[in-house]
């Protein structure tokens, strides 16, 4: 893909793979969309992965995971590297709070399901990039009883602000 598109930042919405080829440029969103389409066109399962905010800068990033040898491997979109699981973002991803992707339809895999809709399932794939451990959050009222339907915001502190990475409303007391 690096032969078809050069990186160029913009604030525009993500364009289609064909538009990226026609203009010969795009940001990480366009480049990763192009590579996912190219890999899928030759029968390689692929998905776009996204972090809404890095721990070290007030910016986001998108890249690609491709299925090979029984597991997902990551690669930069139009950033050629000689091997899989190597990118400029290895170190930042290891400190990230959230790396996610959307799977069309219902998903019953090993990754944490963050959101399910009629059309897609959003999953957290951070365990592909960093050591993780389960975290249980219990919201209680002043009497110490669990609160049903409590909303919890998971935030990342960076650039003197708390950025919401995930908003979770519990369906039951937790």
What is each model feature region?
Residues 112-132:
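Extracellular ectodomain segments of secreted/surface proteins
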Residues 168-174:
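Conserved small/polar residues in nucleotide/adenosyl-binding loops
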Residues 1, 5-114:
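Hydrophobic/aromatic-rich core segments of domains that either
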Residues 50-53, 59, 125-131, 148:
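Membrane-proximal bilayer-interacting regions
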Residues 142-160:
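Short, ordered, surface-exposed loop/turn motifs in non-cytosolic proteins
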Residues 63, 136, 151-153:
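Conserved beta-strand and immediately adjacent loop positions that scaffold enzyme active sites
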Residues 133-141:
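A short, amphipathic beta-strand motif
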Residues 162-167:
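Short, intrinsically disordered, charge-balanced linker/junction segments flanking boundaries
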